[in-house]
């Protein structure tokens, strides 16, 4: 029996090292290794990379992180080239070790108390009107990081009075009451928390998370702030069926969620969960039709859709694929 990895604080554990820490092991079969991307999954990179480098430089200068880079998002080039980014607060090391995610796992450092101020100034310098703030899971903090979210929201609004803020929050496992209480006086303009996939595959896809807990978090925020949209998203292609996806959509509506994102899961490395299937654009369009029929005010469904992909357009109800 091999010895467990002794994690050092502040060290990023990725790929094989990260997967070795997950109780439910990822086993890649020969068939899954041979699964190739269809034509609709090909991305054309922009010719001009000046804006991309500019955003990266601004992040580095202020010691900030983007989920676009840390999670290896396939839309990074497009979003950065349009001058948009999703900021990831509370560091770049997650206390969870989900096998679909490319964000590093480990023992994170203490939150940077200057991060809210640096974040607010960077957003002002970039001239953003809509911003998405997300974070790693911080199970090491007594409030799960909720106060840091609130501090960031306050600082951003002080320097950017006309901005709209969307938060993509973790599940605040075991800390929901405290987190929601903290956010009572400083709520975002859109409250987003992803279910990620269907409950049948949760043990493998989201170890440490609970499907009903996440639904309850969304519902309780909506009950406390009925005029603020709630939003959630799923990745598809991890072994779920279309019928199961539709069932999850129904659960979201029952819990008051009005905005939905569905996108194709892509394997970050050979050490991560393999893609079980590529969902066609026609299937995504069908899912969107079903979502709107259920009463979602907006549904962004497509191969490259992610939670924060053109989030400003999503919030305006403009079609995103």
From Swiss-Prot:
[4Fe-4S] cluster 1 binds at residues 68, 73, 79, 308. One of its GO terms (molecular function) is 4 iron, 4 sulfur cluster binding. It holds the Pfam family LIAS_N. Residues 80-297 form the Radical SAM core domain. Its cofactor is [4Fe-4S] cluster. Keywords: 4Fe-4S, Cytoplasm, Iron, Iron-sulfur, Metal-binding, S-adenosyl-L-methionine, Transferase. It is found in: Cytoplasm. One of its GO terms (cellular component) is cytoplasm. Binds 2 [4Fe-4S] clusters per subunit. One cluster is coordinated with 3 cysteines and an exchangeable S-adenosyl-L-methionine. InterPro entries: Aldolase_TIM, Elp3/MiaA/NifB-like_rSAM, LIAS_N, Lipoyl_synth, rSAM. Its EC number is 2.8.1.8. SUPFAM superfamilies: Radical SAM enzymes. It catalyses: [[Fe-S] cluster scaffold protein carrying a second [4Fe-4S](2+) cluster] + N(6)-octanoyl-L-lysyl-[protein] + 2 oxidized [2Fe-2S]-[ferredoxin] + 2 S-adenosyl-L-methionine + 4 H(+) = [[Fe-S] cluster scaffold protein] + N(6)-[(R)-dihydrolipoyl]-L-lysyl-[protein] + 4 Fe(3+) + 2 hydrogen sulfide + 2 5'-deoxyadenosine + 2 L-methionine + 2 reduced [2Fe-2S]-[ferredoxin]. NCBIfam families: lipA, PRK05481.1, PRK12928.1. Belongs to the radical SAM superfamily. Lipoyl synthase family. This is Lipoyl synthase.
């Amino acid at each position: 029996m091999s010895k467990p990895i002794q994690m050092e604080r502040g060290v990023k554990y990725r790929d094989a090292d990260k997967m070795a820490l997950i109780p439910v092991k990822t086993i890649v079969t020969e068939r899954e290794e041979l699964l190739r991307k269809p034509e609709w999954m090909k991305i054309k990179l922009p010719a001009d990379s000046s804006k991309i480098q500019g955003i990266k430089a601004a992040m580095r200068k202020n010691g900030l992180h983007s989920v676009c880079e840390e999670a290896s998002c396939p839309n990074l080039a497009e979003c950065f080239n349009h001058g948009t980014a999703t900021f990831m607060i509370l560091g770049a090391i997650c206390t969870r070790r989900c096998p679909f995610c490319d964000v590093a796992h480990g023992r994170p450092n203490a939150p940077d108390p200057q991060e809210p101020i640096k974040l607010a100034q960077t957003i002002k310098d970039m001239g953003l009107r809509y911003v998405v703030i997300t974070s790693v899971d911080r199970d090491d903090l007594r409030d799960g990081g909720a106060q840091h979210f609130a501090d960031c929201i306050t600082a951003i609004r002080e320097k950017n009075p006309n901005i709209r803020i969307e938060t993509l929050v973790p599940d605040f496992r075991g800390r929901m009451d405290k987190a929601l209480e903290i956010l009572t006086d400083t709520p975002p303009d859109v409250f987003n928390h992803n279910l990620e996939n269907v409950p049948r595959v949760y043990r493998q896809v989201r170890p440490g998370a609970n499907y009903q807990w996440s639904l309850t978090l969304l519902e309780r925020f909506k009950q406390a702030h009925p005029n603020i949209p709630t939003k959630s998203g799923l990745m598809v292609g991890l072994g779920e069926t279309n019928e199961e996806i539709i069932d999850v959509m129904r659960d979201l509506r029952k819990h008051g969620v009005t905005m939905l994102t569905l996108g194709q899961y892509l394997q970050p490395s050979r050490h991560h969960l393999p893609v079980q299937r590529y969902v066609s654009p026609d299937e995504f369009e069908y899912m969107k039709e079903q979502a709107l029929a259920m009463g979602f005010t907006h549904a962004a469904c497509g191969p490259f859709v992610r939670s924060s992909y053109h989030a400003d357009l999503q919030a305006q109800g403009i079609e995103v694929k």
